[in-house]
């Protein structure tokens, strides 16, 4: 329901910070954090497709 699929180009075109998820079942995965639609979304690109999941920003740490 809160998962959106976007292309690799769409994921790279948006400004965002590189982050690592530090809590929950996705802990350790790195990607980008974006703010959209009044919430925070974690973006991970796999095989040329971006997956955007709603996440609390407190579950992420900046890796830049």
Question: Regions from the language model: what does each represent?
Answer:
Residues 1-64:
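Ferredoxin-like alpha/beta domains used as RNA- or RNAP-binding modules
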């Amino acid at each position: 329901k809160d998962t959106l699929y976007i292309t690799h180009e769409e994921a790279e075109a948006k400004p965002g910070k590189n982050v690592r998820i530090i809590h929950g079942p996705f802990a350790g995965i790195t990607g980008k954090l974006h703010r959209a639609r009044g919430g925070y979304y974690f973006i991970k690109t796999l095989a040329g497709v971006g997956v955007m999941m709603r996440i609390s920003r407190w579950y992420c740490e900046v890796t830049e």
